[in-house]
Design a protein with these regions (language model features):
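Accessory interdomain/linker segments of ATP-dependent helicases and helicase-like nucleic-acid enzymes
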Residues: 17-101
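Short, charged beta-turn/beta-strand-edge "cap" motif at the junction between a beta-strand
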Residues: 139-146, 153-155
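C-terminal effector modules of nucleic-acid-centric enzymes and ribosome-associated factors
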Residues: 149-150, 167-291
């Protein structure tokens, strides 16, 4: 079913997006993956990987949405709920370098080398396609509380595993630093919200006291306190807005956009190395997979 959904999306791209735009994207893609020729053994799978990249990793100029996210937004009113839901599932895909940890008859357990998270993937006849410790480029898509492969892969030779894991770890460490920063900002935001609530309660108490007092002197003192609390409220609100902006920037610009870009860049670089190896088997693979 997922393969059919992707084929529908590929067909939609072919019918509704100008061919010049797709050709420009292909040239951009091939800057890091190498030019694809029809006589390459992996031509079909690499073309599918390009279309996945175009739909799922390429951002529309001037937006913070991928091509697929824009397509969904533009057509949400004309598609059936089921179709819309299946496309939204695809937009939530996880692209990674995966390592096979366990192979069962109809599922595999994989480790995402970028996040160190494990996933159980539903996959028919998995023992025919995967072996334990395989490392490969792929995407998984969530659907009905399960995960599925998109079906397009780039498997890397066993001798390259040490190099690939070293490259993936660089991103893992960067992402971990972003998560630590996010946790710190979220704690700060929580602290600010508590201050805001405490300030609001204090303001209401002072207002009640002012209403109940008959003493002019006491009322003046309470009014002064109220003004101070209102000034504090303005400062707290400003801090809350600033922290919210920092959290939003970190989540969108760093963790989503820059994170996806760095993952895509590394995966495409490795795919190009794999293509060189495919074309030149007489060269030792360790002379290809290197910085």
């Amino acid at each position: 079913m997922l393969r059919e959904t992707l084929e529908q999306l590929f067909e939609f791209v072919a019918q509704h997006i100008p061919s010049e735009q797709i050709m420009m994207a292909k040239k951009e893609y091939q800057k890091t993956t190498g030019e694809i020729y029809e006589d390459d053994k992996s031509y079909n799978s690499r073309m599918a990987l390009f279309l996945e990249w175009y739909l799922l990793d390429q951002y529309e100029p001037g937006t913070r949405q991928t091509v697929l996210e824009n397509i969904i937004e533009d057509n949400s009113s004309s598609w059936t709920p089921d179709r819309l839901e299946s496309y939204k599932d695809v937009s939530k895909n996880i692209q990674a370098l995966f390592e096979i940890k366990k192979v069962r008859d109809n599922s595999v357990t994989v480790l995402d080398l970028f996040t160190d998270e494990k996933y159980q993937i539903e996959e028919e006849d998995s023992k025919l396609a995967f072996r334990k410790n395989d490392i490969f480029q792929g995407r998984i898509v969530p659907h009905n509380d399960k995960y599925f492969f998109t079906g397009y892969f780039c498997f890397h030779p066993k001798k390259t595993q040490l190099y690939i894991k070293g490259e993936a770890k660089k991103f893992y460490l960067l992402q971990r630093s972003w998560k630590k920063e996010l946790t710190k900002l979220e704690k700060e935001s929580s602290k600010i919200q508590k201050l805001y609530l405490k300030n609001a309660v204090s303001i209401e108490k002072i207002k009640t006291k002012i209403e109940r007092t008959d003493s002019g002197t006491k009322r003046d003192k309470l009014t002064g306190k109220l003004l101070g609390l209102k000034e504090d409220k303005i400062k707290i609100e400003a801090s809350s807005q600033q922290t919210g902006k920092e959290i939003g920037h970190l989540k969108l610009e760093k963790m989503k956009i820059e994170g996806r870009s760095l993952i895509s860049e590394l995966i495409n670089k490795l795919a190009y190395m794999n293509l060189k190896w495919e074309r030149s088997r007489q060269i030792d693979v360790s002379d290809i997979y290197r910085n």
